[in-house]
Amino acid sequence: MRRYFPLITLILIVSCAPLSKYQELPEVKAWESDIEKFEQLDISKSYPSDAILFAGSSSIRLWSTIGKDMLPYNVIQRGYGGAKLSDFMVYADRIIYPHPCQAIVIFIANDIAGNDDDKSPLEVSQLFKKTLYIIRRKFKDTPVFWISITPTPSRWHVWPEIKEANGMIKEICSKNKNTYYIDTEKYFLSSSGLPKNELFVTDKLHLNEDGYAIWSKIIKNELNTVLKNK
């Protein structure tokens, strides 16, 4: 049985990660032009209210077949390369609020990448909590899906930290109503427990056509399971 935090508990938890800590960081402000492009799209194009909003980092942006792969669902695609939860959180209202939709699907994988400025798994989970709170201010009951961070060859050296962050986010999802964790890990690991190189392009980070085919099947199955009961 899923046990849910009351909203006031969520508010208290996320208060330790204020937006102001990140809003003025140059690496966050650098995405302003990308967000403005999304806003121009929102002005110039209309979307059906039953659409699924896919938002996050480059794996969302580069998903060229997303419209076909997600049929019969209508799709709104809002991905920008290099997104981290620390900047997505700042821009979440501008990305998500314009779109009353059937569900929101998020994939962000760059907060732990083997860099000096990596966040800890706990920090990643706190940023997810804050992002979820921002979404819930506008869309209290809209299903929110978090796609687990993929085990990739290029970031295998930090997989223990990524896996820990995944586990923390999974726990958060299990305790919040209408919030779902899409676990993709086992589909991208071989029988030896290593990432399947054949599912990635040459950078060994982003999915190739076969990788997206697996991703889309998992994600659509989760959407079908949840939304058919709504």
Language-model region placement:
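Loop/turn elements at helix/coil->beta-strand transitions in domains of secreted/extracellular proteins
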Residues: 49-51, 73-74, 99-104, 139-143, ...
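Catalytic His-Asp segment of secreted/periplasmic serine-dependent ester chemistry enzymes
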Residues: 151-230
